[in-house]
Amino acid sequence: MLLKDKVAVITGGAGLNGLGFATARMMAANGARVFILDLAVAKPEVAAAQLGPQHVGLVANVTDKASCEAAVAQIKQLAGRIDILVNNAGITQPRKTLDITGDDYDAVLDVSLRGTMYASQAVLPLMIAQNGGSIVCISSVSAQRGGGILGGPHYSAAKAGVLGLARAMAREYGGNNIRVNCVTPGLIATDINKGKIPDDKRQAILDGIPLGRIGEPADVAGCVVFLASDLSKYCTGVTLDVNGGMLIH
């Protein structure tokens, strides 16, 4: 198994139809002990229970640094180490540039970008002490092509920020044997976009995807598992596109 005896932490992983939970499920199937962090309303303990008794769901808010640190302290007490962090938590909003309010901007940037920084800051001291670890950050094709299917420009900005932050951390912590990489999903079938794309627009999107289908959460999860595992042990600062060819660059 690719992740045998590894301890993995996944933020925003409680949504059963989302990228985070698909990643949690695949990591568990590959031997990792998984800790799912999410807001109380998302019931991370219920999601973790579906993976098996050794997996744990903890309430944490990635926009609150103290909350991230408390969760990591609890994981350290329970598992003794953290080998993998998946910065998956994020939100989107369908806004045009002139319609984005300050509150909109703060909400999206806080979860996707600030949350990635705070969760990484909480985990990094433990990884440094262990002399090793893998951090995988979920960005988006929206960061690369200047807009997505549903997310507004502030979402593109947040996810572009995640790319820059991950690359900078990769450069900073390579000497500690800590790898930091990004995955940039295209359109993936999750609850975020379920029922929100009209049939005519959906067909136009499909016409622009060489592989001819919308992605599934497991498509992204497989790439995250690869970057988290030793199969990619000489990869850091990488951006791995998972978009079916929607953007080839």
Predicted stretch roles:
Residues 3-35:
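Canonical Rossmann dinucleotide-binding motif of NAD(H)/NADP(H)-dependent dehydrogenases/reductases
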Residues 140:
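Residue(s) in the substrate-gating loop at a strand-loop-helix junction
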Residues 225, 236-249:
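Short C-terminal tail/terminal secondary-structure segment
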Residues 41-42, 60-71, 102, 218-219:
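The beta1-alpha1 cofactor-binding region of Rossmann-like NAD(H)/NADP(H)-dependent oxidoreductases
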Residues 120, 158, 166:
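Active-site helix of classical SDR
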Residues 125, 167, 171-175, 233:
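Alpha-helical segment proximal to the catalytic Tyr-Lys
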Residues 96-97, 104-109, 193, 205:
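Substrate-binding pocket helix/loop in short-chain dehydrogenase/reductase
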